């Protein structure tokens, strides 16, 4: 990625990224609160205010590498009646909230593209400034889909400190649970080395899963490969890209 040339599009992505991270962490806090833990609520972390959840490095990583995080919501397990089960529920709440946001953005994009397609067929597709506004709306909705899916997939990795580890541990037999917990730091380091090793070799399993999911969602909503709406969608994105890079 050429960071400077992509900077305008990255700036357009800011509200979407902040919303995705804020919803994710708020979902953790809300789930914990409903299960009896008031910690997140007492610290004001059940909120969509991005300042409360902001982590500079996680935010920049999300923009540049599409892999990021927010400031973790504190959880006190002593309030839980069934700690392993409740930790799993709290862990799942974050990724599930991002999946819901991705679906909402997809439905909104589908509605917008329905009207765009009708305008194209009736030769009333807007030009000049209105075409740019329409392109911006489509781009932001698409980023909302992509960023939320990435955040959900990334956090479902079943290794600490990701949310997937909390879900995974809930299904481990008791005798294995403490053994895995003992070595979780080494497991995390090993997985990080593996991830960067695959990236160095040009392999991106998370990106492949992301593309597969987005393509699948597009097909479900009638925007699969070869459709006129997909062609118009790509046209609007290219129009915005041309404006950004020419500027």
Task: Write out the residue ranges for each language-model feature.
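Hydrophobic transmembrane alpha-helices and their immediate loop junctions
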Residues: 1-247
């Amino acid at each position: 990625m050429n960071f400077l040339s992509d900077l305008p599009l990255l700036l357009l992505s800011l509200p979407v990224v902040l919303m995705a991270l804020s919803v994710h962490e708020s979902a953790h806090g809300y789930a914990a609160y409903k299960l009896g833990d008031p910690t997140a609520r007492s610290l004001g972390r059940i909120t969509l205010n991005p300042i409360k959840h902001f982590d500079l490095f996680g935010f920049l990583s999300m923009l540049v590498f599409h892999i990021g995080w927010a400031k973790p919501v504190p959880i006190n397990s002593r309030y839980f009646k069934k700690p392993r089960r409740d930790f799993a529920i709290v862990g799942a709440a974050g990724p599930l909230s991002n999946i819901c946001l991705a679906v909402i953005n997809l439905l909104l994009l589908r509605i917008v593209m329905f009207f765009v397609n009708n305008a194209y067929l009736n030769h009333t597709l807007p030009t000049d400034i209105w075409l740019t506004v329409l392109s911006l709306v489509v781009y932001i909705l698409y980023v909302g889909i992509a960023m939320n899916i990435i955040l959900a997939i990334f956090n479902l990795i079943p290794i600490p400190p990701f949310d997937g580890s909390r879900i995974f541990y809930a299904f481990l037999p008791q005798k294995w649970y403490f053994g895995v917990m003992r070595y979780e730091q080494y497991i995390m380091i090993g997985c990080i080395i593996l991830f960067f090793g695959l990236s160095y070799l040009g392999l991106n399993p998370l990106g492949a899963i992301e593309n597969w999911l987005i393509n699948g969602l597009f097909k479900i909503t009638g925007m699969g490969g070869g459709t006129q709406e997909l062609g118009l969608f790509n046209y609007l994105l290219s129009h915005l890209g041309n404006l950004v890079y020419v500027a």
